[in-house]
Amino acid sequence: MNLDDKLRGISLSDEKINELKTKPNLIKNMEVIVNTGNNFTKMQYSLACIAPKNCNLIELSNLIEEGYVTNDSLLKGLVKLGKKSKDEYIDFCKKHTYNEQDIINFIRLLKEKKETKATISSKLKEQYLYYDTKIFLKEMENYNLNVPMEKYTKNWLDEGEIKFLHKPGENPQKTKKIMEDHLKRTGGKVITRFPPEPNGNLHIGHAKALNLSFEYAKKFNGITYLRFDDTNPKNESNELYNGIIEDVKWLGFEPYAITASSDHFEAMHEMAKTLIKKNKSYVCFCSLEEIRARRSKYQKERDEGNDDPLILSPYRNTSVEQNLIEFEKMLKGEYKDGEAVLRFKMPLKSKNPLMLDLVGARIINMVHDRKQKNYIVYPSYEFALCVCDSLEDITHSFCSREFYTRQEPYHWLLQELDMYEPVQWEFSRLNISNTVLSKRKLTKIVDEGLNWDDPRFYTIKGMRRRGFPASAINKFVQSVGITFSETIIDVKILESFVLKELMQIAKKATCIINPLKVYINKCTTGIISNEPVDVNNIIYIDKDDFDETNNSDFLRLTKIQPVGLINLGVLKYIKDESDGIRCELLTVDECKPNKFIQWLPNLDNKVELRMYKPLFKSFDPDEIGYMNDIDLTNSLEIIDGYVDNTVLNTHIEDKFQFIRIGFFCCDFDSIINDNQKKLVFNLTLPLNKNY
């Protein structure tokens, strides 16, 4: 049986198979697995999708075949484990294979305690690290707490480790004078910052960081800087600067000041010279590839007893005088990009790989977009972050947890410069289901044809365009709380916050998607949206509201069952017509209907509806490779709709509840002027037809 047949055997379509053939690494992985002779199951396919280079595919495939790997989460854990012996793999599987009933009982216990979905998911991950997520999804189906959402956001900064953070003045410094000077400058205020790179768009994960930085400072009457980490002019633009400022303000945050790392570039050049004079920095002429190779070699040699620092760089012992000369040459542009870098001469006792002589500055011979100046020598992220935190007297430097290993070089550098040291505090990234948030991954999807503000993305601009209120986004990220452990939050929890906000602010209007012409025998004057409407002998209802089969479970119009028309009367079927149906219009006193449906007096107001579904099919798209899980075709359907007159006076971003269809937001693709009007609405959240 060839590979195509194997893939069809796990229910992949021919279209999907042809798409996979464009991914040579994936095909190679699948061929390796097929050649083992093992059954090619969906889990074997998942292994092929997520396996990195040098992964022990054959061993892991055998473990799946032998029944040691029972779910995709455990498989992902094995892959992260790296190359191990079979016995080590088996021990890992046994350690993280759990009794399904124990997991179910654990979930049900938390449900009895009225815990939120997010809390249950987080606690489940802590207790059963590599549990089968399908168990969670099944147990949490239709689990909705009837608890005010304010309960989840009220005390979010008073829970967990964050309530034990230091007060200004309590964080230790190299000297007492450094702290005294800091307190004189700040008056003991809490000072935080939000430091995005202007090389992409903010997403919902950034909303969590924004809320933490701004709300923590606000709680203590402090201030927050919006500081751009603009150390790489190759990837930055004024458009991205302005877009980030717009997003921050749209979410409701007003920074004390907008600053940038580039405000301090000249100061950092002088600091670099200070470090050279202290013999704590040197100019290195190794390429970046050679630097990486030498670091790897040094770690290996050190483990074997040879800790010669010159393995890291043959230029490490260059004299101070010569380093000053070489650095001046860098500043004057006498070296090309990549020919020379400034490296920190760090203590090598630490096992932290980020203490292996980090690059402090490099040559990028181009004009900085924001400053409109060519600095030639640009500081690295590691250099700029700690220096700018110190210069802005940041008291609480919040970072996502992957920055944990950066703490050591952060404090080493500030101590060598005799500068004030802020405290770094790490929190977990926000991960939500059915999407990806990584800038690298989103960029790859953008390359497939989507825009950064596509409503299927959970970028701030994408969510705004889709119609998510800023208040709902903020309340959601606050409800998740601040933790160190990572978990995936069900996107339905976010949607529940969005729904609650929209119920309060969205204007109700009538919309019909599949119009059915209805001839009525008796005309009257009705009321629609509180405005009198002349009803002629023709109206329109939605085809989905009429069932010709007289199904007893159908609660709207049938040939034997009347239905109410909102603010008009009761419709009773008489007979079919060539282009519709004929009905009698009765009063509610004459006939009590089971249900009321929307209707229109005409089809004069045609609009475009963009019906969005999740961009990814799986709860965790990364489990099978996010590009294999993406659904570009079925995640957007564009259809026509017909609306009542109240919708005509809409503005961009106005939010509507189209009765019994869903919540919609007026898109900026709409044309609204005196000469032309074309309205486009994005589906924010659908409603059940019987809502």
Curated annotation (Swiss-Prot):
Gene Ontology molecular function: ATP binding; glutamine-tRNA ligase activity; sequence-specific mRNA binding
Entry GO terms, CC: cytosol; mitochondrion
EC number: 6.1.1.18
Any single GO BP term: glutaminyl-tRNA aminoacylation
Enzyme class, UniProt record, top EC level: ligase
Any one Pfam family match given in the protein's UniProt record, by short name: tRNA-synt_1c_C2
Residue numbers binding L-glutamine: 229, 381
PROSITE patterns: AA_TRNA_LIGASE_I
Short motif ('KMSKS' region): ranges: 436-440
Residues at which ATP binds: 197-199, 203-209, 429-430, 437-439
Domain of life: Eukaryota
Catalytic activity field: tRNA(Gln) + L-glutamine + ATP = L-glutaminyl-tRNA(Gln) + AMP + diphosphate
Keywords annotated in UniProt: Aminoacyl-tRNA synthetase, ATP-binding, Ligase, Nucleotide-binding, Protein biosynthesis
'HIGH' region, short sequence motif: residues: 196-206
Family from the record: Belongs to the class-I aminoacyl-tRNA synthetase family.
Protein name per UniProt: Probable glutamine--tRNA ligase
Organism encoding this protein: Enterocytozoon bieneusi (strain H348) (Microsporidian parasite)
